[in-house]
Amino acid sequence: CGTTGVIVSAHTSLCAAPIYENGTPEQKAKYLPKLCSGEWLGAFGLTEPGAGTDAQGQQTIAKEDGDYWVLNGSKIFITNAGFADVFIVIAVTDNVLDKRGRPTKLCSAFIVERTDPGFSVGKAEDKMGIRGSSTCELIFEDCRIPKDRMLGVRGKGFQLAMATLDGGRIGIASQALGIAEGALEETIAYVK
């Protein structure tokens, strides 16, 4: 079923894979066993209202506060959000000047847990298809996460996100092809 494919693809390629590929040994030990066993479900938060996946349009920010990162902002259209336990989230951590002296935003990736203070899942989307898959917004209101939950290198979150999406596209393309083949087979059987 299409829904199962989307849930599993988002879970494995968009949440577990970036932890496997970029996580510290401690992050891998904490998250991968529960994600791989299915005890925990994962999601990936990049898309924002008014910005989509444009790195320079990102409004979700993460500021250092002692031993914590404090996240503020929101994400939309997040697959698995209604039921996920772990989220990979992209947020702006640095505003710098590029080589030409223009202001630019550097994003970083973070591991957010459903129970983190200041984090909540917003409204569910009323979708036309793949309705069994939960798609919701993520809300960060002074969401405090320990500093050791940064995933990968500071300021390289956009690169991490793009590499992650490359892997996710394979799963979604495979699903689309399978659904199209199934629809064609059913159509041929019907018209005979």
Q: What residues fall within each predicted segment?
A:
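Short Gly/Pro-enriched turn/cap motifs at secondary-structure boundaries
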Residues: 50-53, 77-80, 100-102, 127-134
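A structural signal for short hydrophobic beta-strand segments in well-ordered beta-sheet cores
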Residues: 60-63
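Internal helix-loop-helix
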Residues: 1-29, 33-39, 79-86
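Glycine-rich beta->alpha junctions and the first turn(s) of the following alpha-helix
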Residues: 119-192
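A short, Trp-centered hydrophobic/proline-enriched beta-strand micro-motif
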Residues: 38-46
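A short core secondary-structure module
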Residues: 72-121
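Cysteine-centered functional microenvironments
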Residues: 45-49, 72
